[in-house]
């Protein structure tokens, strides 16, 4: 389902909250740090500053490369950076709790209420279980989050105790999200060591993620494509 997308015509010159401003807030730094400590304790892959930074950067780049408004790119980057802070409370329902935490932080920083609402919606809808790409900002955050598959996310030091999530992430040596604005195609290109994890194992845990990525791409008036070891899937 495609939605109307705003274009970079006549953008406001009023000073607005940026990702740099958000990163400076001590609550943001502490919540991300403690959220990842909780993820480590329960055996999950990395959800700390590395993941937050990558998702913020990719989420910023998607609207920008598609020619959308500059402010949409900035809002996507802020939502991408904050999307997992709800894990500081509990992994369960972290999109909802993260959205509420972001409301408090961004409100204190003086962000416009309409922009806070956009970011809350993006954070609250970023998971494949019950999320939906409600707008371009949310779509960018979803794709950016789900495309961060990489061996560096594995926090378990013992390969003998890897679960399927660890094996699949550990097997991905290279991950790149390619945006082709001319042909309206967004491609997730992975280099996977199939001796560490099979392509079928990848699909076993990532099928629903790829479905929501396809929906997100449609909102951006694009097609989503998965490429593993130079093969289109």
Predicted regions, residues:
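Charged, low-complexity surface segments at secondary-structure and domain boundaries
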Residues: 1-4, 128, 194-198
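Acidic/His-rich, divalent-metal-binding segments that scaffold phosphate/diphosphate chemistry
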Residues: 2-94
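Generic alpha-helical secondary structure signal
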Residues: 13-16, 26-33, 114-117, 135-138, ...
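Divalent metal-dependent catalytic cores for phosphoryl transfer on phosphate-bearing substrates
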Residues: 39-41, 50-51, 64-179
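Aromatic/hydrophobic pocket-lining residues that form π-stacking "cages" and hydrophobic walls in ligand
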Residues: 59, 140, 213
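Terminal helices and disordered tails flanking the catalytic cores of nucleotide-processing hydrolases
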Residues: 148-233
